[in-house]
């Protein structure tokens, strides 16, 4: 909600629905004022003006505790066993190989680790392991360039998932032994599916890739922490990814 006109639209929409209460997972005073003007009596919200130092998991947990809900920080997604078996058959997934999800997409350019980093990691794994890589990404032009670059070198051992829906991809992820993902939707989905997930953190707070016990964050070389505007995608080290990969699957 970035303009007065947009705020007016939101106020009308909210008021027309006659809500009794609202939950605002944000510290914005603007959202609170819109809800008050719309006549909502009970407003549950993160503490105001605390966004900069806010712990996104703890803030949400404390907010939900106000209505006696206790939520863990390790969300889980359940996939029907029959769908997992069906994906195994449809994609000829072999348990004799290490099946690896590569989440190569991302919501912004600064989150998209360059193709050469993934290719170097693939090259390292092939020296010691027999692997199949499932490439999960969207249709964004930059994402497609990353996808094509990887396929140009490793087409025989890579399967692209960019034409599959999320519901089709979930059982495939569940068949994987491990995932290596940018900070993207696939890192969260993979971890929630109880698959060990190495998260490549280049430009967002470390917490986003470490809140789950299934997440193993990798940060750029030369940095002790990572946050918004770290711009570290060129400093992600494939050898560090491989070292973490070996420690997880061994």
Regions found by a protein language model. Name each.
Residues 1-6, 10:
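Single conserved hydrophobic/aromatic residue that forms the stacking wall/gate
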Residues 12-22, 31-43, 192:
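Glycosyltransferases and closely related glycan-assembly transferases
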Residues 14-19, 93-96, 129, 175:
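Glycine-rich phosphate-binding loop signature in dinucleotide/nucleotide-binding domains
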Residues 15-27, 176-181:
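Short N-terminal targeting/anchoring amphipathic segment
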Residues 40-111, 115:
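Mid-sequence helix-capping/hinge segment at a functional interface
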Residues 49-50, 188-250:
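Nucleotide-sugar donor-binding patch of glycosyltransferase catalytic domains
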Residues 117-203:
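Donor-binding and catalytic core of enzymes assembling or modifying cell-surface/extracellular glycoconjugates
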């Amino acid at each position: 909600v970035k303009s007065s006109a947009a705020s007016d639209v939101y106020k009308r929409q909210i008021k027309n629905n006659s809500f009794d209460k609202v939950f605002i997972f944000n510290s914005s005073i603007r959202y609170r004022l819109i809800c008050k003007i719309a006549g909502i009596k009970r407003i549950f919200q993160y503490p105001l003006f605390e966004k900069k130092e806010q712990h996104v998991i703890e803030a949400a947990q404390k907010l939900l505790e106000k209505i006696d809900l206790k939520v863990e920080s390790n969300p889980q997604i359940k996939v029907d066993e029959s769908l997992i078996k069906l994906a195994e058959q449809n994609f000829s997934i072999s348990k004799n190989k290490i099946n690896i999800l590569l989440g190569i997409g991302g919501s912004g350019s600064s989150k998209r680790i360059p193709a050469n980093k993934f290719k170097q990691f693939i090259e390292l794994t092939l020296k010691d392991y027999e692997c199949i890589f499932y490439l999960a990404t969207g249709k964004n032009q930059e994402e497609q360039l990353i996808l094509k670059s990887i396929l140009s070198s490793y087409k025989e051992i890579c399967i692209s998932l960019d034409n599959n829906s999320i519901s089709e991809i979930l059982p495939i992820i569940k068949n994987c032994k491990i995932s290596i993902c940018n900070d993207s939707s696939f890192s969260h989905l993979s971890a929630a599916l109880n698959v060990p997930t190495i998260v490549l953190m280049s430009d967002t707070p470390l917490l986003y890739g470490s809140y789950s016990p299934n997440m193993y964050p990798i940060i750029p070389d030369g940095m002790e922490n990572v946050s918004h505007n770290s711009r570290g995608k060129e400093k992600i080290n494939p050898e560090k990814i491989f070292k973490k990969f070996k420690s997880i699957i061994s």
